[in-house]
């Protein structure tokens, strides 16, 4: 059954799953991905209609004035051994300011640049420890707070038009974050990477389809976006299944055109690394398989015998892979204890 037919039918019968959350070992390489009946896409359907048409019709939504310089406001600087942490903000193309930490190694560089994106319940603080580990490898690292993390209650899902507005804003803010990195005089703009965790991994696939200055996209325990996450046949824990049918239909109409599964197939020539877990209670295995299958080549896929919180080996694998593409020293990465 095609995805568009599934979405229409889901306006009436829907089962949801719990939200993608922020989570601060044995690795096995996935076998060739076979079609899965309950997944959103099979390998054979990747890149076909309606995904291709959705991409072409909506990719412009993430455009912004890339030619204008970024006005960075520095609020505080903290010197630590071998690097400095800059507490900054920069204007969002959709209004307001984007809070961020910019972690810069001591010395002139040139350095690679890495952009980090947190999970749904997180903020720039969540990945600051990872940023401090990554800076040791010879990279300028930036971690931002998404739109929901800038609000007092941090509600990241509303099942209204606000979800669409915030997701578009997030992608623009991340693209503007690339501008911040490339404005740094000690950053080599040809050596840029992205690592996203959970929700950050789901949004990373969307970003990969529109932002090709980044060479390496590391996607840790993600799936194909919010429509995928809340509408495929999963555990009824997300709240979507309790909404009136008309409200479900309005939300699907707003969100389907910007679901990551339609964009990750356009990442090339950027490379993708999908990391997923066999016992993940938040990202169902069929959804992960569909996301992986939809991704363009070149891509790498690894599965871990863990839950949503990946083991230390996954971080080592990720940094080693990123190092090969953007020229950082992975031997200096300590990783989570």
Feature map (PLM): residue ranges:
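C-terminal catalytic histidine-bearing segment of alpha/beta-hydrolase fold enzymes
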Residues: 289-337
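Gly/Ser-rich "nucleophile elbow"/oxyanion-hole loop immediately N-terminal to the catalytic nucleophile
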Residues: 158-198
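Conserved alpha/beta-hydrolase "acid-adjacent" motif
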Residues: 281-287
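N-terminal cap/lid segment of alpha/beta-hydrolase-fold proteins
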Residues: 63-108
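Cap/lid segment of the alpha/beta-hydrolase catalytic domain
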Residues: 121-175, 229-237
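Short beta-strand/loop motif that positions the catalytic acidic residue
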Residues: 267-268, 273-276
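Short beta-strand element of the alpha/beta-hydrolase
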Residues: 100, 110-119
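Hydrolase active-site cap/lid region
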Residues: 203-253, 303, 313
């Amino acid at each position: 059954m095609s995805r568009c037919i599934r979405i229409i039918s889901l306006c009436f019968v829907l089962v949801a799953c719990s939200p993608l959350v922020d989570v601060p070992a044995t690795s096995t390489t996935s076998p060739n991905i076979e079609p899965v009946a309950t997944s959103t896409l099979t390998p054979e359907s990747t890149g076909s209609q309606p995904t291709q048409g959705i991409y072409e019709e909506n990719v412009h939504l993430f455009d912004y004035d890339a030619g204008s310089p970024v006005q960075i406001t520095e609020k505080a600087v903290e010197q630590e051994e071998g690097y400095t942490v800059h507490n900054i903000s920069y204007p969002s193309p959709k209004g307001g300011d984007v809070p961020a930490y910019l972690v810069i190694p001591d010395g002139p560089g040139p350095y690679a640049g890495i952009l980090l994106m947190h999970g749904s319940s997180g903020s720039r603080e969540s990945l600051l420890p990872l940023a401090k580990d990554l800076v040791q490898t010879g990279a300028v690292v930036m971690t931002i707070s998404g739109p929901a993390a800038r609000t007092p209650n941090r509600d990241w899902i509303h099942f209204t038009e606000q979800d669409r507005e915030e997701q578009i804003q997030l992608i623009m803010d991340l693209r503007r974050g690339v501008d911040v990195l490339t404005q740094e005089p000690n950053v080599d703009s040809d050596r840029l990477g992205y690592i996203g965790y959970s929700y950050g991994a789901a949004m990373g696939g969307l970003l990969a389809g529109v932002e090709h200055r980044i060479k390496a996209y590391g996607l840790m325990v993600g799936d194909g976006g919010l429509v995928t996450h809340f509408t495929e046949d999963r555990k009824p824990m997300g709240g979507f299944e309790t909404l009136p049918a008309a409200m479900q239909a309005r939300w699907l109409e707003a969100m389907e055109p910007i679901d990551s599964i339609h964009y990750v197939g356009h990442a090339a020539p950027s490379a993708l690394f999908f990391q997923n877990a066999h016992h993940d209670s938040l990202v169902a295995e069929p959804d992960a398989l569909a996301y992986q299958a939809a991704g363009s080549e070149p891509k790498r896929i690894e599965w871990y015998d863990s839950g949503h919180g990946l083991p230390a080996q996954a971080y080592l694998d990720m940094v080693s892979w990123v190092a090969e593409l953007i020229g950082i020293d992975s031997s200096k990465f300590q990783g989570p204890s």
